[in-house]
Amino acid sequence: MTNIRKTHPLLKIINSSFVDLPAPSSLSSWWNFGSLLGVCLGVQILTGLFLAMHYTSDTATAFNSVTHICRDVNYGWLLRYLHANGASMFFICLYLHVGRGLYYGSYTYSETWNIGILLLFAVMATAFMGYVLPWGQMSFWGATVITNLLSAIPYIGTDLVQWIWGGFSVDKATLTRFFAFHFLLPFIVTALVMVHLPFLHETGSNNPTGIPSDPDMIHSHPYYTIKDILGFLVMLTALASLVLFSPDLLGDPDNYIPANPLITPPHIKPEWYFLFAYAILRSIPNKLGGVLALVMSILILAIVPILHMSKQRSMMFRPLSQCLFWLLVAVLFTLTWIGGQPVEHPYIIIGQTASTLYFLIILFLMPMISLVENYLLKW
């Protein structure tokens, strides 16, 4: 008799996606981040749902409702900090997942890669709108500064900004719509994930060597499910440690001051996971140029498959490309640091140098080094 998981209309979809899915036998821990992102998304949706039951999206009461959640709701403080720090874990896993894709050449699965870029944009939009909801100083001024960037778009810019604001400044209408979109977007992200996975399963997973592994496949369950569970435990331990020992480590103290349109904070900055893009934005003196550079800092991932010049897929056997990759990682850390610093010497020139290097490495140096490595293969 055939097992029910192979015949039941719903169970067979789950079976083919998680149980009997053929996977390369050589997958390292870098392949854990997809499942970790799934757990992060689940944690965020659940904690967010319970927070939404107590939150009020009104400028007069939003800040107080967050205080009420932390002080008066049973385990409200835990929900709030799990949600805030869960976002940080989400982005750590996201950036490591993208970095894995770049290092091992997973971007050659173009459909999966492009849907992944859409997912990245959707998660970034969700996180930005979520940062506005507590209605602290950094929430208000962050929303004002970032939405104002759209005014750099020629002809329609000013009208577009006022349309998003729902008035002539960030106010009650803005907060209400941001809450609505912040609630809606995670479900759109979930839908995109459900498109991301079938495209991946259509081609099968890449592996660290970058060599086709069709003759050497194993079942996902139990081999990789056990490995994923270990990943869950490590990540959830890290998240629990952050939430219980230092919940405000990654937040901004200014967000504990209620939003005041009459007092500008001395240094407006987004959450840490956007600082690299914020540094690229600030490094260009022209407003429209800065906005274009900001968008391109993420959108550049879409042209990475076109720039792949190497005869080998993975960087595992390409030491010169490896050096460039880790230089790129160092540049991103530098940009993250610069994004959190005031706009003054020497931070301005460091930011401009790092921004130039970021685009230079991806657009020119990586393809050139790949061609050099191709030539060296002949020796």
UniProtKB/Swiss-Prot annotation:
Its cofactor is heme b. It is a multi-pass membrane protein. One of its GO terms (cellular component) is respiratory chain complex III. Keywords: Electron transport, Heme, Iron, Membrane, Metal-binding, Mitochondrion, Mitochondrion inner membrane, Respiratory chain, Transmembrane, Transmembrane helix, Transport, Ubiquinone. Binds 2 heme b groups non-covalently. Changing residue 356 to V: In strain: Isolate TK 17308. It comes from the Eukaryota. Heme 1 (or BL or b562) is low-potential and absorbs at about 562 nm, and heme 2 (or BH or b566) is high-potential and absorbs at about 566 nm. This is Cytochrome b. It comes from Artibeus obscurus (Dark fruit-eating bat).
